[in-house]
Structure formats: C-alpha cells, structure tokens
Amino acid sequence: MMQNILLFLDLDDTLFQTKRKNQNGVIPATQSAKAGRGSYMTEAQGLLFELFHDSEKVKIIPTTARDFRQYQNTLLSQSPRIETAILYFAGMIIEKGIPDKQWQQHIHQAYQQLNLPISQLLTQFEQRVDNHPQFTLYNVDEYYITVKAETDCPKATQDGLFSQLKTLKTSEYFVHQNDRAFSLLPHFLDKRYAVKYLIEKYQPELTLGMGDSLTDWPFMQQCDFRIIPKEAQIESLFKIID
C-alpha cells in the first residue's frame, strides 16, 4: 500500500525524553537507555508512536536536531519502516542511511556563501569557553556550534557565559537555546525548508507535523495538521481562555 501520509516527527521532548525531564518514561527509546541512561517514552508516547508506525499509509520522517551518530542511537532509527530522516536541524536528509544528494548540494552551497564560516566562529567560541571547565564546546560535524553546561553548573554561571556567546551572533546566524545547551546556527539550517523539500518530493495527500518547541512551529506550519504534546513550549503561542 502506498504511504500517502507523511508524519514529520520531532524526537526529543516530543516522542521521548530523559528521566530527569519526565519520571514516567518507562519504554527505552535509545540504545543508551538500555544501560540505565538516555531517553525513554511514556506509555502514552509509545502508544502514539505505534499508532502511526503500524499504519501502512503513514511514512514517518524523524525531524530532529540530532546529528547522525545521535540519531543512530535511537531505537526507531533501526526500524525498516523508517527510511527517511531530517537531521542537524535540516543540515542533512538521509534516505536509507545515505544523504540525499540534491539536498546535500544545496546545503553545501549555502555554507560556501557564509561571510563568517563555521571554522572562524569556532575560534571565537574557543576564546570564550576554554577557561570555563563547567562547559563543553562542540563543533557538530561542521554544521553548527554548541556549548553545553555541566549538570552541576550554577544557573548564574551558565546565564553569564551564554550572554557573552550571544554577542558572537551575526545576521547570518541565530541562537538556539535549550535547557543547558546554547547553539549558533546559520539561518538556512531550518527544519521547515527540509520539510517543504520532502513534501514537494513525495507529493503526499496528507501531512502531519508533531513537535514541542517554538523552533518546531515553523516546520509544523508546513503541514495540514499539527500535533502538540501536553505542556509543550509551543503552547505559549496560544492564549486559551478556560
């Protein structure tokens, strides 16, 4: 049966999360969860995933900030029914584990046109982060730069460094901050563009977008229907009167 429904599915904090964020997570969602750490689904999240995964009409497309290695750590990435995924905030689209060549070329050209390349931005980050042992700096496969604070890092210390890092932002980049992580990404790394690309490629009869954060909302707006978890950050967009 033809998969004429596309579900663009954000992963972290939508389909699963760490125990620290939700103690009700009981179903391992990542390889590392089997060892007692990592991410888990609640019973409700597991049932929702099964609902779509078991339907022959639905093509699930994980739409995530995770890099390739982190995506491979998820258990759903091993499903033979999930062949396509959007990774690195849309920096890469994979089909059966192989990068989509047309999209890869498009992204490569966008990076070449940056006035401030990732390599130079990394140098600027290093100058500010190297003297702070409670933070770790990541060059995420040349796609973007992330700084993560240790779990025991005081909030005031975290906020202070992140405020300094915000001054490095230029018109070519935007800030993405999530819990203990601070990232600077080029504006073209946007899930909505990859979603639009795949909708045009597959020409589905129905599209669904599922996400929890404000940064997910633009890609969800490309879809016919949107699914939002309870108590999601996205709820702040709506002023609902009881």
Q: Would you name each region that the model predicts?
A:
Residues 2-60:
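Active-site neighborhood of HAD-like aspartate-dependent phosphohydrolases
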Residues 9-21, 88-90, 96-98, 140, ...:
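Short loop/turn segments at strand-loop or loop-helix junctions that form parts
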Residues 41-126:
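Active-site phosphate-binding/coordination module
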Residues 70-73, 194, 218-219, 236:
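Phosphate- and divalent-cation-binding pockets in alpha/beta enzyme and binding domains
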Residues 211-215, 230-233:
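Short, polar loop motifs at secondary-structure junctions
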Residues 222, 226-242:
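Asp-based, Mg2+/Mn2+-dependent phosphohydrolase catalytic module
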